[in-house]
Curated annotation (Swiss-Prot):
Biological process terms in GO annotation: negative regulation of NF-kappaB transcription factor activity; peptidyl-lysine monomethylation; regulation of inflammatory response
Localization in the cell: Nucleus
Name of the protein in its database record: N-lysine methyltransferase setd6
Function, as annotated: Protein-lysine N-methyltransferase.
Major subcellular location class: nucleus
GO cellular component, one term: nucleus
Length: 449
């Protein structure tokens, strides 16, 4: 570990040079074995190993005063004074207001850091794609619907909370400069680059999550599910530590958590190549399971019984209008909800009446381990035939909702020349689509009659 912050030389990268000099000034210390670059990385800036690095080595430390958040910004006092008017469900507004001020202030303490993103054009979240492009490339993935919700919420938040607040403080913000477009870009910036300090275990059930914060240097590391470094939090500083050995020339990767490809694209604008993401998932809308159950009803009496069963599942909070059952590469990740739903939907009239009258959802025999095993890849083929039928039909309905045929996507992925001609957006969308379809297709195979 360097005793002083290491000034890294990068030819032709003035913003990066200024930033690294700023890092020295604020006491951010980099290990001599690593350097920041745009070359040789999977996306934009990244960190590379200059020498072999052992597991457990300290890669850099960041003093807490170098973090940018509502408690360190120059407009702290104003944000504290208006705290009540800035409350919202996301908890992001104070940080976003701080960023709006610091990003546009020539005297900002964080200017060398924020200058690395001169105009946010590098951010290519689906929220910046046209609606037609989202709907065409990402149909069935769940991303278009998530983005529509985001954009509606961002506009409402800016109009109802941010604009009235900045109008009250014309010495700090200007609606002509601090526009909705800038606010939207900063939301994407926070989505892609911010960190949220985890709560202590004893506080998890009692406290709200910590607000997001910007962490210079740490936010330049790219993500893969099989990461080789991890950020640790201490009262004095934040530390990036290698969690396995890193060879000279390899990129240093942090992790954003267990993120499926659709989440990575939605929140970070990136996607891991097909098969690389061990955390990839596919969602089956709960409404598709209901649709599958409707298909097998043979009389009005059975249809009425199905409505009663679904109503009870809603009361039990096992299903909801916009809910989804999540499947990963090894089986269900929402096993309690999926198992309980299948069990109740497949009950006879007598079984259902007994279950409802005796509050059967409290039965001890359906333990978590049993449900987990039943809905794993190993357990799915052994489910009762009627259960498998519902899962199979729901998976088929979900696969049919995608715009592109699975075989066409497969051919495109395997055609190196054709794949190379795709735009970055087309490639990322393809990775997301095909990863989800593969999981759903596997589910079809495991539940076929």
């Amino acid at each position: 570990m360097a005793t002083d912050a290491k000034r890294l030389k990068t030819e032709g990268s003035d913003p990066l040079q200024s930033f690294l000099q700023w890092c020295e000034g604020v006491g951010l210390k980099l290990n001599n074995k690593v350097y920041i670059s745009k070359e040789g990385t999977v996306a934009e800036y990244g960190m590379l190993a200059k020498e072999d690095i052992d597991e457990g080595e300290l890669l850099f430390t960041i003093p807490r005063m170098a973090l940018l958040h509502q408690g360190t910004t120059k407009v702290l006092a104003v944000l504290e004074e208006g705290k009540a008017s800035l409350e919202n469900t996301s908890g992001w507004v104070p940080l976003l207001l701080a960023l709006m001020y610091e990003y546009t202030s020539p005297q900002s303490h964080w200017r060398p850091y924020l200058s690395l993103w001169s105009d946010f054009t590098a951010l290519d979240h689906p929220m910046f794609w046209s609606k037609d492009e989202r709907d065409r490339l990402l149909k069935g993935t769940g991303i278009p619907e998530a983005v529509d919700t985001d954009l509606t919420n961002i506009q409402k938040e800016y109009k109802d909370i941010v604009l009235p607040f900045i109008t009250l403080h014309p010495d700090l913000w200007d609606p002509e400069r601090h526009t909705l477009d800038l606010y939207r870009s900063l939301v994407a910036f926070v989505m892609a680059y911010s960190f949220q300090e985890p709560l202590d275990e004893e506080d998890e059930d009692e406290k709200d999550p910590n607000p997001p914060m910007m962490v210079p240097i740490a936010d330049m590391l790219n993500h893969v599910s099989n990461h080789n470094a991890n950020l640790e939090y201490t009262p004095e500083c934040l530390k990036m530590v290698s969690v396995r050995s890193i060879r000279k020339g390899e990129e240093v990767f942090n992790t954003y958590g267990q993120m499926a490809n659709w989440q990575l694209l939605h929140m970070y604008g990136l996607x891991e190549p097909y098969q690389s993401n061990s955390n990839d998932t596919a969602d089956i809308p709960m409404s598709n399971v209901y649709k599958a159950a409707v298909q097998v009803t043979r009389s009005e009496a059975e249809q009425r019984l199905l409505v009663e069963k679904w109503s009870l599942l809603c009361e039990m909070e096992m299903v909801g209008d916009k809910g989804v059952f999540i499947f990963g590469k090894s089986g269900s990740l929402t096993d309690t909800e999926m198992y309980t739903t299948l069990k109740i939907l497949c009950m006879s009239v007598e079984e259902f009446e007994d279950f409802r009258e005796n509050e059967g959802w409290e039965e001890a025999d359906d333990d978590e381990e049993k449900m987990l095993q039943a809905l794993s890849n190993e357990g799915l083929p052994s489910l009762p035939p009627v259960w498998r039928c519902l899962v199979h039909a729901a998976a088929r309905f979900t696969l049919d909702s995608y715009g592109e045929d699975m075989l066409k996507d497969k051919v495109l992925l395997e055609d190196k020349d054709g794949y190379a001609k795709l735009s970055s957006r087309q490639r990322r969308a393809l990775q997301v689509r095909y990863g989800q379809k593969t999981i759903l297709h596997q589910l079809l195979e495991l539940t076929k009659p």
